[in-house]
C-alpha cells in the first residue's frame, strides 16, 4: 500500500519555464492559482473579463518577483469563435506554446429544477463554462 504524504511541499522551481493560462484569473481561485503558479516559476497568462482585476494580479506577481505575466482580457459570455481563434493566434505568436491551462472561469446560474431553468440563462452558463 502506498503511503499518503500529506506534508508534501512542491519545489520552488516546480513550474520554472512553464507557460500556463489561467481563466478567471482576476479573483478567487483563479487569482490564487495564478499567483502560486508564478511563485513556482511559471509564466502566467492572466485571462479574465475585468482588465483592472487582471492588472492587480499582474502587479502582485511582479511585486513578488515572479516571471512577468501577460494579460489577455476576454469575456467568455460574449466571445465568438473568431475571438477564440484570435486568442489562439496571439498566444502562439507571443509564447509559441502552452504547457497547461486552468479553466477556472465559470458561472453557476440559478439552482433550480431543470424544467424551470430559463433557456437564455442556460445558454449564458454554457457559453462561459
Regions found by a protein language model. Give the residues of each.
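Glycine-rich NAD(P)-binding loop of the Rossmann-fold in SDR/ketoreductase-type enzymes
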Residues: 79, 124-128
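Conserved glycine-rich Rossmann-like NAD(P)H-binding loop of the short-chain dehydrogenase/reductase
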Residues: 42-56
Amino acid at each position: 500500500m502506498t503511503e499518503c504524504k500529506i506534508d508534501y511541499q512542491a519545489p520552488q522551481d516546480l513550474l520554472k519555464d512553464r507557460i500556463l493560462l489561467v481563466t478567471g484569473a482576476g479573483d478567487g481561485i483563479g487569482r490564487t492559482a495564478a499567483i502560486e503558479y508564478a511563485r513556482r516559476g511559471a509564466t502566467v497568462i492572466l485571462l479574465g473579463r475585468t482588465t483592472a482585476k487582471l492588472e492587480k494580479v499582474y502587479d502582485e506577481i511582479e511585486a513578488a518577483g515572479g516571471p512577468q505575466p501577460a494579460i489577455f482580457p476576454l469575456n467568455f459570455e460574449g466571445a465568438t469563435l473568431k475571438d477564440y481563434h484570435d486568442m489562439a493566434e496571439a498566444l502562439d505568436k507571443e509564447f509559441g506554446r502552452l504547457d497547461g491551462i486552468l479553466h477556472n472561469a465559470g458561472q453557476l446560474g440559478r439552482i433550480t429544477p431543470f424544467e424551470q431553468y430559463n433557456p437564455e440563462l442556460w445558454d449564458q452558463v454554457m457559453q462561459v463554462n
